[in-house]
Amino acid sequence: NQFIKCEFNNISDFTNKLNKYKNDLAAVIIEPIQATSGFNFVDKKFLSHIKQTISKSNTLFIFDEVWTGFGKTGHNFAYEYFKVTPDIVILGKSIGGGLPLGVVAMKNKIKNSFPGAQSSTFQGNILSIQSSYFFLKELRNINYLKKIKKLEDFFNFHRRNLIEYKFVNDFRG
């Protein structure tokens, strides 16, 4: 009945809290790139440690890809970039094609563990669903990952020139 926060990229803090709450831990949720707090990337060693540690239990591994999904990392999803496979992926923003829509995608073994049909109060907003349909259809029609790669190369080339300015402290990504 509680949410335990761990210091981002701190293996020791994660391990201590995991040991303290391991009998009551249902899931580990991670936002792989914390955009709001300044584009902080999860460390691959930290992510690997989490995945390896919780795979020994029934703890679910959840990726919050609301911000990172659909090509924003140069991959369809950030978990592909980090080479891990979560049990559940949370999606939003882009998938609605500009309209509010959230999606919880999960492995079949989890989906099949819910008896009967599931629903929510605002399920099935037809306008958001149609917008999502056209957004996903458009992604199939264009080679969007190739376009993203070209933009990435362009910005990486030109950011070298920007680093010379004193007001530029850091580049991430």
For each feature predicted by the language model, list its residue ranges.
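Conserved N-terminal phosphate-binding loop of PLP-dependent enzymes in the Aspartate aminotransferase
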Residues: 1-173
